[in-house]
Amino acid sequence: MKKHEIASLSEDELKKQLVELKQRFADIRFNKIVEPPQNPMIFKNLRRDIARMKTALHRYQTQK
């Protein structure tokens, strides 16, 4: 996800997306043992998306 897409999400949507991304990252990481991923850059992209969402959530929480 792009930075502006994440910024447009509400706090609840961010939490939901964060859980989904963490689950997807865990699934891909687990499946890496069985067979290598088609796109190895997916790990880097997912980690960065998770970090962006955590940052946006932190902004919401500090503004309150």
Swiss-Prot record:
Gene Ontology cellular component terms for the protein in this record: ribonucleoprotein complex; ribosome
Name under which the protein is recorded: Large ribosomal subunit protein uL29
CDD domains xrefs: Ribosomal_L29_HIP
Record keywords: Ribonucleoprotein, Ribosomal protein
Gene Ontology BP term (one): translation
Highest taxon of source: Bacteria
UniProt GO MF annotations: structural constituent of ribosome
InterPro entries: Ribosomal_uL29, Ribosomal_uL29_CS, Ribosomal_uL29_sf
Family designation: Belongs to the universal ribosomal protein uL29 family.
Pfam families, A to Z: Ribosomal_L29 (PF00831)
